[in-house]
């Protein structure tokens, strides 16, 4: 197990979502629970270039803290909120989320499948 990683290192990063404008995001897995990969709790750092990233309702809960950047965030059709460094967002099970990334964005997230 690697004890130390620089988050901006390219090694270990994988592409994640693509924004409506074609901008890209990436993730670096920090920790994955043992067992079935689809049912495992995962911890990762997610980074994204400016753009709109939308996710449909999914059978998982997610909590994240914004490390850098700024985005307009909407969870489960509630009011859009501007989020930035230090903000904590909780996405309930089966709640859609959209992030309109305004400035290069990075979050530390934990995803817990609830299928």
Give the positions of each predicted feature.
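A short, N-terminal "cap"/entry segment at the start of jelly-roll beta-barrel domains
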Residues: 1-40, 44
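Short hydrophobic/aromatic-rich beta-strand segments that constitute the beta-sheet cores
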Residues: 55, 73, 107-109
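A generic "binding-loop/recognition-motif" signal
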Residues: 49, 59-60, 79, 95, ...
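Ligand-binding loop in jelly-roll beta-barrel domains
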Residues: 85, 93-115
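Short acidic-glycine-tyrosine-enriched beta hairpin
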Residues: 77-93
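Conserved short histidine dyad/triad with adjacent acidic residue
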Residues: 31, 42-58, 92-93
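A generic structural motif
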Residues: 74-76, 100
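Short, conserved beta-strand element in jelly-roll/cupin
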Residues: 48, 57-73
